[in-house]
Design a protein with these regions (language model features):
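Conserved mid-core alpha-helix of short-chain dehydrogenase/reductase
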Residues: 49, 95-102
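Rossmann-fold scaffold of SDR-type NAD(P)-dependent oxidoreductases
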Residues: 7, 60-70, 92, 117, ...
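N-terminal Rossmann NAD(P)H-binding glycine-rich loop of SDR-like oxidoreductase domains
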Residues: 7-19
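A conserved hydrophobic alpha-helix of the Rossmann-fold in NAD(P)-dependent oxidoreductases
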Residues: 46-54, 173
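Rossmann-fold cofactor-recognition segment
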Residues: 33-48
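Conserved glycine-rich Rossmann-like NAD(P)H-binding loop of the short-chain dehydrogenase/reductase
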Residues: 24-35
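Catalytic loop of short-chain dehydrogenase/reductase
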Residues: 69, 76-89, 94-97, 108, ...
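C-terminal helical subdomain
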Residues: 155, 162-165, 174-213
Length: 213
């Protein structure tokens, strides 16, 4: 029974991941901004404060970096809220590095530790549309950050991978999105189940196929 830390578990894909992990007999530990519903209170606005927020995490086998945001409201290349853009980069690109740094001592205690980060299909460098450019850039950035992270604990046998969940029917993805969050969550956990050090640094579709960065 693996203990899995899932960030941003109060709604959307994070809530679905929590349900899927419980159904699979695992022990998920969720995080929310305010610690509601027996979750850990975790805010990602200040990466330097993340270690202190997770100091009592306890034993851990897996991290799923899921928390993220699609902001600011104005994020066109010709009309950008730059403070909002910077905040998006903090939450979506920098904090996902601070979280594994904070919990790595606990992961090292596990017999089979793993790290997954939820990215986006819009992180793909071939996606040229200018809509939501701050979000797209933040997800492209987290891909590169996590590629780099994968090389650091590789000698210790700790694999790290990224997952593209597709367009998911959540508040962020919208009702018109194609993918059911529960199905996506099961796919993500299936990737985690078979993840080995040979897969470290890879980018997967939630269905399990490798995909291009």
């Amino acid at each position: 029974m693996a203990r899995i830390l899932i960030t941003g578990s109060n709604r959307g894909l994070g809530a679905a991941l929590l349900r899927a992990a419980k159904s699979a007999g695992q022990t998920p530990i969720g995080t929310t901004r305010d610690g509601r519903d027996q979750t850990i209170a975790l805010t990602l606005d200040d990466p330097d404060a993340i270690v202190a927020q997770l100091v009592e995490i306890g034993p851990l086998d897996m991290l799923v970096n899921n928390a993220g945001m699609i902001t600011p409201e104005r994020q066109s290349p010709l009309d950008m809220n730059f403070a909002g853009f910077a905040h998006s980069l903090t939450v979506n690109s920098i904090a996902p590095l601070a979280v594994p740094q904070a919990v790595l001592p606990r992961l090292r205690e596990s017999a089979a530790p793993k790290i997954l980060t939820i990215s986006s299909q819009m992180a793909w460098m071939g996606y040229r549309k200018a809509d939501r450019i701050a979000y797209h850039a933040s997800k492209a950035a987290v891909n590169k950050v996590m590629q780099g992270l994968a090389t650091a604990p590789e000698p210790e046998g700790i694999p790290e991978a990224l997952v593209d969940p597709g367009g998911v029917q959540t508040d962020m993805g919208g009702a018109e999105a194609e993918e059911d969050p529960d199905e996506v969550s099961r796919g993500i956990l299936a990737i985690a189940e078979r993840l080995t050090i040979r897969d470290t640094g890879k980018f997967f579709r939630f269905t399990g196929e490798d995909r291009a960065f």
